[in-house]
Amino acid sequence: MVMTDPIADFLTRIRNANQANHSVVEAPASNIKRGIAEILKCEGFVKDVEVIEDDKQGIIRIFLKYGQNGERVITGLKRISKPGLRVYTKREDVPKVLNGLGIAIISTSEGLLTDREARQKNIGGEVITYVW
């Protein structure tokens, strides 16, 4: 069976592992998934990211982060732009997630950026996902 939206599958794997309090989640690797995982690491939503190279596609391993009492750091993940309905934003209309408490990951001409970085660089693009 052909997967129509590998990014949604990647986000769903993270969401399900997070809700089940797993410490590690693995998914097939791609450049955009690596970029999303690195942004999640830089923004403090996950502990670490490893890319395991094999002779095929590779595997991306994400170490999830929890608070001192076991509370989730990632409260929500939502796929915004989908293959059937792409969502783009102009540079003036870059969204804020929960008034800045969350992040929007945007695919721009300069690569994957958070909403904050896109606002600073004054560029728009395709809104991939919201994380809070």
Swiss-Prot record:
Spans traversing the lipid bilayer: none
GO MF: rRNA binding; structural constituent of ribosome
Record bears the keyword Acetylation: no
Keywords: Ribonucleoprotein, Ribosomal protein, RNA-binding, rRNA-binding
Keyword Ribosomal protein assigned: yes
Entry-linked InterPro entries: Ribosomal_uS8, Ribosomal_uS8_CS, Ribosomal_uS8_sf
A Pfam family this chain is assigned to: Ribosomal_S8
GO CC annotation terms, alphabetical: ribonucleoprotein complex; ribosome
GO BP terms: translation
Gene3D superfamilies the UniProt entry points to: 3.30.1370.30, 3.30.1490.10
PROSITE patterns linked: RIBOSOMAL_S8 (PS00053)
Functional note: One of the primary rRNA binding proteins, it binds directly to 16S rRNA central domain where it helps coordinate assembly of the platform of the 30S subunit.
Assembly and oligomerization: Part of the 30S ribosomal subunit. Contacts proteins S5 and S12.
Similarity comment text for this entry: Belongs to the universal ribosomal protein uS8 family.
Protein name: Small ribosomal subunit protein uS8
Species this protein is from: Streptococcus mutans serotype c (strain ATCC 700610 / UA159)
